Amino acid sequence: MKKLTYLFLTILIIACSDDEGNPCVYSPTLVTDAATNVTETTAALNGVINIVSENCDNPNNTEQGFVYATNTQPTTANNKVNVNGTDINTTLENLEPNTTYYTRTFLTNVFGEFY
């Protein structure tokens, strides 16, 4: 009976230990360059998405690229163009003439939405 009690207590202590290891640190850096080759209806976009991830699994279902809108802080609820990679670029077409657009790089995954 003593051995059984000892075994039970050992299992209980191990099961209740607070050993969660190192915490996940997920820190993306996003850069949006000024638009180039701007015409009345097109604009070339360039940016950089650099992900620093320590002790985290790489998330699935990641979306990244550019968002754009006529408001100063576009989000994924506005227009978006998905572009994969670290150094990213695309050309927006069919823009409204004589309209100012604002752009940002974006990254969305289980860790959140980043701009």
Show which residues each predicted segment covers.
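Sec-dependent N-terminal signal peptides
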Residues: 4-14
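Short, surface-exposed linear motifs at loops/turns and structural transition points
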Residues: 16-115
